[in-house]
Every structure is written in structure tokens, then in C-alpha cells.
Amino acid sequence: MTKKLPSELKQTRKSIQTACEFCHTKHIQCDVGRPCQNCLKRNIGKFCRDKKRKSRKRIEKHGTQPYLNLGKRLVIHDVPSKTVSPSSVHLQRDFLSSDQEKPGKTPAHNTNIQYTYNINDNFQSAGSIPRITNFNTNNGQTVLENTSNNISASQAVHLMNDPIIPTVRKSTLNLKSHFLEQHKAMQQPLATNCLVATSNVPVHSGMDDSNKSDDDVDDETNIHFDSMWCNDEYMKLKDIVDISTPFLPNNSQIFSLQESEYPNPSASTRGNSSLHLTNLLNSTKSVNDQKDSSIGHSTSTFNTYDEVVSRPFISLDMLHLNRGANANTQPSHNAKLESECDSSSHSDADLEKHDTDFISPSKFRELVKTPQDLYDNKCLIKLHNYKLAYTKLLTTLRKKFLEGAEIDKSASVKDEHSTQKHNLRYDLEVIIRSILERYAPIFISLTSNMIEEDLLLQEVTLQRALLDLENMAKLVSCTPMCIWRRSGEICFVSNEFYSLTGFNKNLLLDRTSFIFEYLDHKSVSNYFQIFNELLAFGYNDINKRKKLLMLNACSSTSSKITEGFSFTTDGKAIFTKCNLLLSNGLYLKCACCWTVKRDSFNIPILVMGQFLPIFEMD
């Protein structure tokens, strides 16, 4: 049996309300004195002080306050007419008895009714309330109900917003479709009896039946989260995965624009005017400008959140320096494209004049010869102006395909000459269409988050990889090699390539020259289709991609993709054939290998081409 303690010892061991910090830490008995006996024994009496406890969060009791008349008010947070998530949403409703509505009286009890409904269910009207699953009171009772349609809609209904549950809005996963859907929603009339107080967007449950039938297909795949960061990440991931649905015009849209501008197909495709392709290429831009202007007037009534969700694009100051010059030179070049053959050369001269930061590859290599020189002279590395590069590329392609068709009059038969011009125009359309449909959507998705420092790092990575490739070409006797950027600008040419083609080194590296200038029309068309579809960003299923590329190949004889090309397992190289231009004006048939070099963002920065001549025996 435990010995009973004396009363003095019991009083000493009696627990106190607040212990000191030392006794609280050591879990020993403290006394009311300060300093306490434990601290005095250990000579730490000057540090003895009460332990501060965290204040408890006490639940405030509801006082007797008169209930305010809530009136006929329906508050709903992001509740669409049709939703796609299988989650559940909980509604909480406060019912007031008849005696509680009078001011000055305390309510007997509070009643909470919890509604649970499947988001896949469709609302028939704005006043419809989902099925009641349980009935909770303060006494702990639970009553199951079957329906709540007989409850008056005039009572206050509060939606408990769950930030995890996605809600549906009139938006799609890409920028242009998102704005077009918003513009379409603004044009649709909304019933006045369906206007409710919302936090973000109007509820579509009160639309006409015709409007609901039109939106059934759109709402099935349009998911919008309450968090703008989560929604932005979802859109970018969806764009990267779903690369088969670009937001730019597809084949049918381009040909529909062509038919709308040229009702007569023969007059549009076989006419003598070369402005047909220029108008066709600019038609998409004009239509988009008209839509953007109309959308800009209507989107002012939308919430400011819509502006935050808009897809970011890379916009640097150096890219805007050439805006005025390009705006002045472009219309004059398009107007004189057919009559003056020297208009493209004037345009190139104007672009070179305004490109003050341009350093030719030969001059840059004189300054930077080793990797250490690259980092010592890092100030010399500037952001490459790809906007200006693609402008020059478009001018080069127009000159090669359109003006080449006008100058080449060696055909003996007029019909044969007309067919040749038609095929060259069609080849240029195929090239531009492959860029818009295959390359541009994925490129925009990958670069939407890049900043100016990322672009500078990309240029440093390009120059560092270029040094390694040049050293490889100089150390060993390799096949004729040429290295160019993703825009086609030549960066390096090996000595074997000079010996094979007969061109001068200064002609290729002292100015902005493109690899497409030294390939024939068929090789250029094949390169763009293979690069945009397979080589630029890689591929998963080789056979599937190859079959898709064959099916998408045009029926033109000059632009039909050759069947003799193969791939590497890592998806970074393609083996095919091409016709290489020589200094005497003739073309040499070569077997070539195109190898791509990508950066950490999986964006192509360099393409290395190796050419091996094929000599046919008679």
C-alpha cells in the first residue's frame, strides 16, 4: 500500500496554474514562488519566469440578435448549367421558422440541410434544387428526404465553394478559341429572370434551349479551375500533350478562305497574277484582326480574371525595333512582287540596315574560338532576332518559288509552263501550311513561359554546341557538313562542303544565307514537312508518324515526299535524299542526314546536315 503523504508535502506537490519555463521543459513540479526552488537549486533563478501559453481560440456564442430580412436573393458561386466533373458540391441552407422572422426573438434552434448532387446532372431551371441526402439538426438527428423541389426558391441559398472542384466556363484550351467563345457568349441573349449574383461568370442555366443545344459539345471538354495558377498549368500541359489540335488554321480553313476569295478555282490557281498566294497567306491575318477588334469591344464587360488567363507570349524590346520598318517595306514588296524581280533584294537590304545587332558567323568566330573565349566575351552574345530571320526566310521562299516560276520560261509548251508555275505555288502553300499546323502550335506551347534570360541562355547553349560540332568537323575528315539554325540561317560550313559545291566561304558566312537557297524546290518542300512533323520536337510512334506524314503529303509531283527516308531510335536524326545546288547552277543528288540539337526546353536550336553525293552509273 502506498504511504500517505503528510499535509505539508501534499501542499508542496499541489499543482499550480502556471509553471516556469525550466520546470515546464523538464516536466518537474514547480511552485508559486518566483524564482522557484528548482531554479534556485540550479543557480538559474534570474531566468525563472512564467511559461507563456498559447491563447485558446474560444468559440464565440451567438448572441440574441434580430435576424435581418434576407429577401429574395440567390447567391451561387461558379455553378454552370452543365458540368463535367464527377465530384459533388455541398449546399447549405438555413431555414427560419415563422416565429424567428420577427425581430427581437431568439431562435429556438438552427437547422442545416446538406444537399449533395452529381455534377453530371443537368439543371432544368435556375430555381431547381438538387436532391436532399441528409437532414442535420443541432440535436444530432438525421432524416432522409427524397426531393426538395417543393422548397421555395425565395429563401436564401448559400453555396459552399470548394476550390478544388473545377467549374465550366466558355473557354477552350487555346487562346484564339478562348476569345472566340467569349465573343460568341456575349452575342447570345440572356433571359432577365436568370440573372443572379455571381462571383466570376454568369450562370448559363437560364439560356434558351437552342443555346443549350449549341453548347453541349463545347462544355464537355472545357474545364476551368477556380485557381488561375492551376488553370494556367492545366492549359499548358494540355497544349503540350494534345498537339494534334493546333489553334492555327487547318487545311480546310485555308482552302475555305481560298474559295471565298477566289470563287473560280481555275482563276485562282492558274491565273497569271502571283498575288494570289500573297492574298491567301494574308487572308488569315486579316480575318483574325477583324475578330480581335470585335472581341476587344465586347470583352470589356468580362471579369478582369479573363485578362489574367490570356496566354503569355514572348515580347522583347529588340523585336519591336523593326516593327515600323517592316510595316513600311511589306506592302511595297507585296505590290511589286510580280512586276519587279529586284523587290526582294531591296527588302533584304532594308532589313539588314535596321538589324544593327547582327554579327555575321565569320566575324563572331574570329572573336570567339574556344569555349573560354565564349564565356570571357559573353557580353558579345545578344538575343538572336528570330522575327527578322523568319521575315527574311519568307522573302527568300517567295523569291525562290514565285519569281522562279515567272523567270523560268524554257518550257516549250505553254501548258507545261503553266503547270510548273502552279506546282511551285502549291509547294509554297504546303510549306507554309506545315509551319502553321505542325510547328507553330508546339513551339508556342513550349516557349510561352520563357523570359528574356531564358532566350539569352538558349543563345549561349547554341554557341557552345556549335563550337563542339565545329571541332568535330575539323579534327576528323568527315563528310561535307553544314550547320544551320531552326530558321534555316547557316552558321557553319565545313571545308568538304566548299569542295563539293564550289561556293566561296565569304558568300555563305559573311551575310545571312539560308540552307534553302542551295536546295531545289522538291528538297525544300520535303525538308519542311519532315522537320515540322518529325524532327523538330521528336516523335513517339515512328511508324504512325511516318504513315501520317505520307497521308498528309500533297499530291503535287514536285512536292511529293520521297519514300526513301528512315529514322534513328532517339528521334534526333533522319536519313533521306536531296538535290544540292552547285556553283555552276546544276544540282547534285545527295544522300543526307539531318540531325537536330535541342535545348533543355526541348526546343530545336541547331540542325546539322551531312551530304554524301550519289553518282549514278549509266
From Swiss-Prot:
Region of interest called Disordered, as start-end residue ranges on this chain: 325-353
UniProt KW Disulfide bond keyword: no
SMART domains hit by this protein: GAL4
DNA-binding region: 20-48
Entry keyword set: DNA-binding, Metal-binding, Nucleus, Transcription, Transcription regulation, Zinc
Any one Gene Ontology BP term: cellular response to starvation
Entry's localization field: Nucleus
Family matches, as PROSITE patterns: ZN2_CY6_FUNGAL_1, ZN2_CY6_FUNGAL_2
Record field: compositional bias (Basic and acidic residues): 335-353
Pfam families to which the protein is assigned, alphabetical: PAS_13, Zn_clus
Cellular-component GO terms for this entry: nucleus
UniProt-recorded Gene Ontology molecular function terms: DNA-binding transcription factor activity, RNA polymerase II-specific; RNA polymerase II transcription regulatory region sequence-specific DNA binding; zinc ion binding
Recorded family membership: Belongs to the ERT1/acuK family.
Task performed by this protein: Transcription factor which regulates nonfermentable carbon utilization. Binds specifically to 5'-CGGN(8)CGG-3' and 5'-CGGN(9)CGG-3' sequences in the promoter region.
Protein's recorded name: Glucose starvation modulator protein 1
Organism taxonomic ancestry: Eukaryota, Fungi, Dikarya, Ascomycota, Saccharomycotina
